[in-house]
Amino acid sequence: MTAPFVLAVPSKGRLQENAEAFFARAGLALSKPGGARDYRGTIAGLDNVEVAYLSASEIAANLARGSVHFGVTGEDLLRESIADADQRVLMIDGLGFGYANVVVAVPQAWIDVRTMADLDDVTTGFRAQHNRRMRVATKYINLTRGFFAAHNVVDYRIVESAGATEGAPAVGTAEMIVDITTTGATLAANGLKVLDDGVMLRSQANLVAARDADWSDEARETARVILDHIAARARASKYKEVRTRFKGCNDALLAEAHKRFGVVSPFGGPTSSGMLTLHCPPAQIYGLGSFLRDHGADTVSVASLDYVLDKDNPLFSKLAAFLRQ
């Protein structure tokens, strides 16, 4: 029996909801035949795909081991848990949810500390005065070490955080923190501020491929089908379909529309009867419609696109190139 193609997605909360919605929009609805509490699922029409519901950190670990082919997880977890992440996994595409920044945050009372260079001065002075290093509370040990080294900050020690990291300075278990934030509101509520150059990583949920997975011919074909769906939906979301027909429609008019409105003519120029189909960025719809009517069109129709299937699939090409390395 051929081994299944394993797609790992988050097992709870908003990340699970957003991941399921993302795949559903691409025509890849995930389902749990065993019920809502089942940790295994399927994709209709792709019988060889097994959906594994795991925590975000478990997904990163399984991608590193190659025990799943695709996974949905944050870049922050990949960079933290996989030392040579760019060699072992491929971030195929950002999914537009799960946004969070990994940041260096210090007490707001440190009014003279605004940059990593300021922090270097403060940590050096702190060690000279107290004969110990400043403590940094964080779950992101590897990211912190790398970022601090890049800024030549050495007089610190990491206190691994198991709970609410932002509370560490207030309770006296650390002087500063490295943590994730979306709006900064929680940090501010705890009397902390992000350094001006203290954003270590701008993360979001990604569709990720594992180099060490079993990439049989069947697995590659399954990946191509999945990525074809995703790419088709992504193309469709960028445009509205505009259709019209009038005698004055010609190649010169089309060239001007391309230049002014950023349209794409997926089926070529106007037909002999003046029929024209264009794909237009949504923000340019009214301008394009006015332009076409000014040049002789009586009617211009606009429709939403569900999918735009193209011969070339940049997502699969990216995966194929990664697996050849």
From Swiss-Prot:
Keywords: Amino-acid biosynthesis, ATP-binding, Cytoplasm, Glycosyltransferase, Histidine biosynthesis, Magnesium, Metal-binding, Nucleotide-binding, Transferase
Domain of life: Bacteria
CDD domains noted in UniProt: PBP2_HisGL3 (cd13593)
Entry keyword annotation includes Nucleotide-binding: yes
Annotated metabolic or biological route of this protein: Amino-acid biosynthesis; L-histidine biosynthesis; L-histidine from 5-phospho-alpha-D-ribose 1-diphosphate: step 1/9
GO cellular component annotations of the record: cytoplasm
Catalyses which reaction(s): 1-(5-phospho-beta-D-ribosyl)-ATP + diphosphate = 5-phospho-alpha-D-ribose 1-diphosphate + ATP
Free-text activity regulation comment from the record: Feedback inhibited by histidine.
InterPro entries named in the record: ATP-PRT_HisG_long, ATP_PRibTrfase_cat, ATP_PRibTrfase_CS, ATP_PRibTrfase_HisG
EC number(s) on file: 2.4.2.17
UniProt GO molecular function: ATP binding; ATP phosphoribosyltransferase activity; magnesium ion binding
UniProt entry tagged with the keyword Metal-binding: yes
Disulfide bonding pattern of the chain: none
Compartments in which it is found: Cytoplasm
Entries under Gene3D superfamilies matching the protein: Periplasmic binding protein-like II
GO biological process: L-histidine biosynthetic process
Database matches in NCBIfam families: hisG (TIGR00070)
Functional note: Catalyzes the condensation of ATP and 5-phosphoribose 1-diphosphate to form N'-(5'-phosphoribosyl)-ATP (PR-ATP). Has a crucial role in the pathway because the rate of histidine biosynthesis seems to be controlled primarily by regulation of HisG enzymatic activity.
Name of this chain's protein: ATP phosphoribosyltransferase
Gene: hisG
